[in-house]
């Protein structure tokens, strides 16, 4: 594997720390008034999800992690695993466990594309697209004139996610939702 210097590490870089693949969240270069410069690096363990900070001397190197982000289509869940298929034409399938799926579980929709992080051929993490279109399964009915005061109400989507929506949204409507914040963006167009 190739090595990467602390000065070359950027947010999103993948490195091996203590034998585990980690993603760099933040890299802060510190030059104290006295002593040698160092880098304070915030890391997230890709296997466990644990986040911590570690200090490295300026110029230290770490081994790059052999992780691969792959576009995959969500197929189904059997209750224990969530199954994904590669969209590159190989039809290769991978089963992700609950720790790999994590918070993305509430945005999983069949036949939708997701980014699956693979390490040694096993899924470590599943990331949802920034925006996804989902149908409203349950919400209070909209009443004529509700839009005047600009309030909101909870709506439960087909995946089980709860999103606050404007009062005029009804059951069966398809919404565009920001998966990063979990907020309603708009009604889906073309449906």
From Swiss-Prot:
GO cellular component: cytoplasm
One function term, GO molecular function aspect: translation elongation factor activity
GO BP: any one term: peptide biosynthetic process
Statement: the UniProt record of this protein carries the keyword Secreted: no
UniProt function note: Involved in peptide bond synthesis. Alleviates ribosome stalling that occurs when 3 or more consecutive Pro residues or the sequence PPG is present in a protein, possibly by augmenting the peptidyl transferase activity of the ribosome. Modification of Lys-34 is required for alleviation.
Entries under NCBIfam families matching the protein: efp (TIGR00038), PRK00529.1 (NF001810)
PANTHER family tied to this protein: ELONGATION FACTOR P (PTHR30053), ELONGATION FACTOR P (EF-P) FAMILY PROTEIN (PTHR30053:SF12)
Protein family: Belongs to the elongation factor P family.
Protein name from the UniProt record: Elongation factor P
């Amino acid at each position: 594997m190739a090595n990467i210097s602390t000065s070359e590490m950027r947010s999103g870089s993948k490195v091996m720390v203590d034998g585990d693949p980690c993603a760099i969240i933040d890299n802060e270069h510190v030059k104290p008034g006295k002593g040698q410069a160092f880098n304070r690096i915030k890391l997230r363990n890709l296997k466990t999800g644990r986040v911590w900070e570690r200090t490295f001397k300026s110029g230290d190197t770490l081994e790059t992690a052999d992780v691969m982000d792959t576009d995959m289509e969500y197929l189904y869940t059997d209750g224990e695993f969530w199954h994904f298929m590669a969209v590159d034409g190989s039809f290769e399938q991978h089963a992700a466990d609950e720790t790999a799926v994590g918070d993305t579980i509430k945005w999983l929709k069949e036949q939708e594309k997701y980014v699956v992080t693979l390490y040694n051929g096993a899924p470590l993490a599943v990331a949802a697209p920034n925006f996804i279109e989902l149908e409203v399964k349950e919400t209070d009915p909209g009443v004529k004139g509700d839009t005047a005061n600009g309030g909101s109400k909870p709506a439960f989507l087909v995946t089980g996610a709860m999103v606050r929506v404007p009062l005029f949204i009804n059951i069966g409507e398809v919404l565009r939702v920001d998966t990063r914040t979990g907020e309603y963006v708009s009604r889906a167009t073309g449906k």
